[in-house]
Amino acid sequence: MLTKTNDSRLIDRSSGFDQRTGIYHSLRPSLSLPPIDQPLSAAEFALSLLLKSSPPATAGKNIEALTYLVNSSSGDNLTYGELLRRVRSLAVSLRERFPSLASRNVAFILSPSSLDIPVLYLALMSIGVVVSPANPIGSESEVSHQVEVSEPVIAFATSQTVKKLQSSSLPLGTVLMDSTEFLSWLNRSDSSSVNPFQVQVNQSDPAAILFSSGTTGRVKGVLLTHRNLIASTAVSHQRTLQDPVNYDRVGLFSLPLFHVFGFMMMIRAISLGETLVLLGRFELEAMFKAVEKYKVTGMPVSPPLIVALVKSELTKKYDLRSLRSLGCGGAPLGKDIAERFKQKFPDVDIVQGYGLTESSGPAASTFGPEEMVKYGSVGRISENMEAKIVDPSTGESLPPGKTGELWLRGPVIMKGYVGNEKASAETVDKEGWLKTGDLCYFDSEDFLYIVDRLKELIKYKAYQVPPVELEQILHSNPDVIDAAVVPFPDEDAGEIPMAFIVRKPGSNLNEAQIIDFVAKQVTPYKKVRRVAFINAIPKNPAGKILRRELTKIAVDGNASKL
């Protein structure tokens, strides 16, 4: 059915598609945001939601006594009261110690996840300083490139990571976060009455420079404004308030804090008064132990981790009954795996979602029981968002059921790539549309489906083969723990699909069996035609497969090195 709006657009009530403009509109209720001209930082906004809106986790409780963060390795924790005091203390200390540190200056952060990282993020954002965190295990050349891109005036590191900054000359130098001086800045006795938000921060000001994964080239610095972060936080906050199931939420923080989803999960938890458990180096059994010990109710996962949960015998060893939901993203989740997961964990919901660093995290997700059974879909686009499906060849906007490149527009879309006007213009057009590079389609009910990355399709003769489709089939094999499919150069076909397989321990699965297993389930041009067995599939911190690494390994013939 079509609805005629005041501006004469015709919007289908079921799909949200406007046939005149080619735009898909979110069917979720529009969300009111603070006036754009109101001075407000993302840090102040999140803390105001915690203190003023009485989220479910804080109902009838002393907010300051609630636990915000727990380090699963050491058992150390940080309460919300301590968080507020330390943010105030650090903000004051930084302004006193570095009087020239000004709003819009950039602070580069190179540190493993710890209880102090959220304090540092909030303190810096509250005084208008742009936070730019990077992967602490990155190489010196990678770190040097990120410093060059973000142009910081100051850096925060640890004794273990500071050596990677030796080649970088910063105006205000580098602060060691494990030094006695820094620790003293966190615990000033005179900061209890100080308002850390005295510095005027506009919502249009830059808040963070987060680095893209680099799966399609060298990493870029994604510039997100306070408005971007406020809009993203408002959506997740409102969704949780609408959730009819009210329980104490404890999240397992398996994502690094420098990654956009870890970054946004940190802010979201603050706005809701939730508890986060920091997991150190990721190991499956360590995750199970943490779930059992801290009664974890939810955690972010990638499809390969869902596969591991389905197939692992370790799940019988630990009490995982506290789990209520898993937020799944990073890649499409196959229907077969989702159904097998629900058979094994009938009381755990899979909340599927889609997002990018460039969209400040989630831009679409499932919500509520009816949507969560839409296996294979990443849900509906978020509140206040618009989308297009664009034919890559013609530029034509496509209706439901047709596959093309997903474009997104809304208040969460990045300002651009730092210092890279060309890439910014190529990615976000003059009308504010973000070209995601993902091949997708909407069904007739406004549910979004990810087919594959536009640049990752395998060109077999005149056909295009989506690697994700083959990976989902491979994951359904009981002898396969993990799998990835990449293009392999071929003189006759141009490219052929090559599968990298991680076998179940003790399995004798061979190349011929894999090829036959897939061939029985696909049209001939989609067949896997080459197989290599390896110990682990290389992925980025969000769980996305590093296909370029695998392609290089395949071409070099070095599969045995993994």
Curated annotation (Swiss-Prot):
Keywords: ATP-binding, Fatty acid biosynthesis, Fatty acid metabolism, Ligase, Lipid biosynthesis, Lipid metabolism, Magnesium, Nucleotide-binding, Oxylipin biosynthesis, Peroxisome. CoA binds at R281, K461, A462. The gene is 4CLL9. Both substrate-binding domains (SBD1 and SBD2) are involved in the substrate recognition, and are sufficient to confer the substrate specificity. It catalyses: (9S,13S,15Z)-12-oxophyto-10,15-dienoate + ATP + CoA = (10Z,15Z)-12-oxophytodienoyl-CoA + AMP + diphosphate; hexadecanoate + ATP + CoA = hexadecanoyl-CoA + AMP + diphosphate; (9Z)-octadecenoate + ATP + CoA = (9Z)-octadecenoyl-CoA + AMP + diphosphate; octadecanoate + ATP + CoA = octadecanoyl-CoA + AMP + diphosphate. Disruption phenotype: No obvious phenotype in growth, root and flower development, fertility, reproduction and morphology. It comes from Arabidopsis thaliana (Mouse-ear cress). Belongs to the ATP-dependent AMP-binding enzyme family. It is an enzyme of class 6 (ligase). Gene3D superfamilies: 3.30.300.30, N-terminal domain of ligase-like (3.40.50.12780). InterPro entries: AMP-bd_C, AMP-bd_C_sf, AMP-binding_CS, AMP-dep_synth/lig_dom, ANL_N_sf. It is found in: Peroxisome. One of its GO terms (molecular function) is ATP binding. Its main location: other. Its cofactor is Mg(2+). Its EC number is 6.2.1.-. Pfam families: AMP-binding, AMP-binding_C. One of its GO terms (cellular component) is peroxisome. This is 4-coumarate--CoA ligase-like 9. Residues 353-417 are annotated as: SBD2. PANTHER family: 4-COUMARATE--COA LIGASE-LIKE 9 (PTHR24096:SF251), LONG-CHAIN-FATTY-ACID--COA LIGASE (PTHR24096). The keyword Lipid biosynthesis applies. It comes from the Eukaryota. Residues 283-352 are annotated as: SBD1. GO terms for biological process: jasmonic acid biosynthetic process; oxylipin biosynthetic process.
